Amino acid sequence: MRHRKSGRQLNRNSSHRKAMFSNMASSLVSHEIIKTTLPKAKELRRVIEPLITLAKTDSVANRRLAFARTRDNAVVAKLFTELGPRFAKRPGGYTRIMKCGFRTGDKAPMAYIELVDRPAQEAASAE
């Protein structure tokens, strides 16, 4: 029985999943919008939202926790200098998932996941 087993397996072992979501979270922080499959986007929300909440209060301990999850100093710097202050007044709900059709090769449902309140010039260049 799979009672109380949360999260998607995505046909990967646990270390592959952890590495994949760490990389995807780093990409989302860097580019503020990424295109991926819908199940991965929904699961990425569970990784990125606590990171942004952590970045709202800047401390050495929080920076170390964020680095442990992303393993990238540039991403940690952007989290705490740009994204934390940007979302300081917002109580959660930092990401938006927009469905964008199906992938041509295997008809997998695709989606964009983006950070809300993104600067307008980046939104125009992503299109």
Swiss-Prot record:
One of its GO terms (cellular component) is cytosolic large ribosomal subunit. Keywords: Ribonucleoprotein, Ribosomal protein. GO terms for molecular function: structural constituent of ribosome. Gene3D superfamilies: Ribosomal protein L17 (3.90.1030.10). GO terms for biological process: translation. HAMAP family: Ribosomal_bL17. Belongs to the bacterial ribosomal protein bL17 family. Part of the 50S ribosomal subunit. Contacts protein L32. This is Large ribosomal subunit protein bL17.
